[in-house]
Amino acid sequence: MSEFVAKEMKVRLTFVEEVLGSSPSSEKIYSEYIASKAPDSLDTEDEIEAIGEEDRGVTVFPKQNGKPGVWDYQIKGAFKDACGGLSRVKTTESAKIKAYKKVIDKLIFVEPRFAPYQVNGKLGICERPLRTSGATGERTALAASETLPAGSSVEFTILLFDEKLEPAVREWLDYGKYSGFGQWRNSGKGRHLWDELDTDGNVIGGNNEYLKK
């Protein structure tokens, strides 16, 4: 353990709702998606042009060696989101942290750099309408995201440079039961439970009562 690391927490998140990918995809991936969904309605290039630049992306999961996963900074982003919400509740540990984004950036780290998902089944696609406002007025756009099935999980290690932050980190992990992870998380997508693991992978804490039994 590094001289700067005061505490390590090995964690497993198990998703009780499907997770939506949040990384922008390439236009090539989107073109293939359009062609597979509506091969006879319009020429693919025409349909891509008709959708408009702002509606063009399908958000996906980053992949290494063909396996979907999550980057360390995405997990830290989820911590910031949780801390920002919970800081409004004066009785929480999160409310005690001043300049919480800087604290998470500088004193909390996640390993490995890329954590692969353990996929429960197959990836899918979730389509949903989004209402947007612009110079031409309100319109409804189609958003699409790659999906990870409920029951999937991911493991990673949280490194704390200040062990006084541990209660807040546990609070953020507990918050995942109510507020999700990934794209469209405020709708409940990506809701999860968590286990704290020892070095042998045994469950020693967390809020996942099902896997503790």
Regions found by a protein language model. Name each.
Residues 1-213:
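RNA-interacting cores
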